[in-house]
């Protein structure tokens, strides 16, 4: 790709709240192979920010699926471990008036 500048980094962001399916596999393969083709990295980011739905068996299923697909992410990130960082950047965006907090109730949304 002649327009790419810097290192290519792709990510795989499954939510470990259900078993992975064929759509996950296709997405994982596209992201992984794209990063490989351009000498970049692929990051697995487990988007586990809904504790009511997340289960260990789903984390395990994602890992088993990646092994079966022969995908080895460069880095594994657990989103819930990064909440302090997310809040810090959200606060900064709000203070700079580049984001806002919505106070609508569920019904109005």
Q: What does each of the following model-derived ranges do?
A:
Residues 1-109:
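N-terminal Rossmann-like or analogous alpha/beta NTP/dinucleotide-binding catalytic cores
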């Amino acid at each position: 790709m002649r327009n790419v500048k810097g290192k290519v980094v792709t990510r795989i962001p499954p939510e470990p709240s259900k078993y992975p399916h064929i759509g996950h596999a296709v997405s994982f393969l596209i992201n992984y192979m794209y990063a490989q083709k351009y000498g970049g990295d692929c990051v697995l980011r487990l988007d586990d920010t809904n504790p009511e739905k997340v289960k260990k068996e789903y984390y395990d299923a994602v890992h088993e699926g990646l092994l079966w697909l022969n995908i080895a992410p460069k880095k594994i990130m657990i989103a819930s471990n990064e909440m302090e960082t997310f809040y810090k950047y959200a606060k900064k965006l709000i203070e700079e008036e580049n984001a806002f907090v919505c106070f609508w109730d569920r019904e109005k949304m």
